[in-house]
Amino acid sequence: SDLLCTDTGINLFAPGKNPKGNMLFLTFLVNALMMVYKNQDLLRASIMSASNSYRLGANEAPPAILSCFLGSQLSSTLDEIVRQVGNEKMTPEEKTTLKLGIGRIPEILLDTTDRNRTSPFAFTGNRFEFRAAGSSSNCAASMIAINAAMANQLNEFRASVEKLMEEGVGKDEAIFRILKETIIASEPI
């Protein structure tokens, strides 16, 4: 399992209790998708061995192709962000509508019981599971690769948000715009 927590133990992949907490959750969720998308080769290299190469994609799940599974409800929430966030300044009504949708995430995830076993990188309610490592393998290399790639992705995300803020875009709107760009860019994964 791949948890990402703060120094005070807050799980950043757990939905929040309010729209602000869910904005944090969505930010880390979307950045995890982009991290996998940009670093597929690194992640594959981190779990590679002769026996694991033979196992992946053979008669066992998961396949050798890295993909992410979120579940239909969470995927539709990301689709809503893409649909609702434009490139122009958002009206207060648009922001409210978007934040109300984000506020429903804990309700959505409580109903999601589907645990897709065929995806090597699946979201299971409050964490991602990286299922590509072999059962007898030491997962240290893959954890180092995931954490380093995630740190790099978060730095890139922050820089993009700060750039928009320097151009006069408000913080929440800048985050929404970069979330939208990141969702679209990482969609193939």
Model feature map: region roles:
Residues 1-189:
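Active-site capping/gating regions of soluble enzymes
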